Amino acid sequence: MSTNDTRIYLASGSPRRREILEQLGLHLERIHADIDESVRPGEDAVAYTERLAREKAEAGWRVVSSCGLPERPLLAADTTVSQDGEIFGKPEDADDARRMLRAFSGRSHQAITSVAVRDGGKLLVKTSITDVFFKSLSDAEIERYIASGEPFDKAGAYGIQGKAGVFVEHIEGSYTGVMGLPVHETALLLAEFGFELP
C-alpha cells in the first residue's frame, strides 16, 4: 500500500527535525506531547532513547485521539549522547555544558537517535547510533561556544550542524542522526506506513 498523502503529525518542537522532514517533501502538523524524560535506574542509552521516542509517540497519539483529529501517521524522536555508559542529555547550565564538552574533547562518543511512528494501533521504532570523534578542545574554544548560547537546547551540549561542527574530526554513522532525525531510518519507518520517499 502506498499513499500520495504527504501529511504527518510531528510530536517534536525541534526545528532541525522539522527542517529534515520538510526537505523530504512531508507536510507537518506539530503536536505538543510532554513526557517525563528521567532516566530509569539501570537503563542504558539505547533503551532510554527508544523508550522516550515510543512514549512521545504515544503521548502525541493521545492528543490526536482526544482532539478528534484525522488519523494519519505521527512521528516522534529522541536523541541522547553517551560516553562510557554515561547518558548526556541537555545541559542544565553553563557548568554542565562545560563538563560535557570537556568529556568529549579529544575522544569519541555516541549520538543515539530513536524514531517512532504511530498510526492507529501500529507503533514502530528504529534507532541510529553514530560514533562522533571530537578534536581536543581548548578552554577558550569551550568558553566561546558556551557564550554563543548554542549548547543549551541540545543533547550533549552541541549541535553538529552549528558552530560545534568545527569540533568534529569525523563521524561513523548518520550525520542527520546526530542532528536529531536519521533520514535513512525515518524513510524505512515511513515506508511501513505507505510513504514512498523520495
From Swiss-Prot:
EC numbers: 3.6.1.9
Catalysed reactions listed for this entry: dTTP + H2O = dTMP + diphosphate + H(+); UTP + H2O = UMP + diphosphate + H(+)
Known cofactor(s): a divalent metal cation
Protein name: dTTP/UTP pyrophosphatase
Keyword Repressor carried by entry: no
Highest taxon of the lineage: Bacteria
Single biological process term from Gene Ontology: nucleotide metabolic process
Pfam families with a match to the protein in the record: Maf
Entry's family note: Belongs to the Maf family. YhdE subfamily.
Compartments where found: Cytoplasm
Entry keywords, A to Z: Cytoplasm, Hydrolase, Nucleotide metabolism
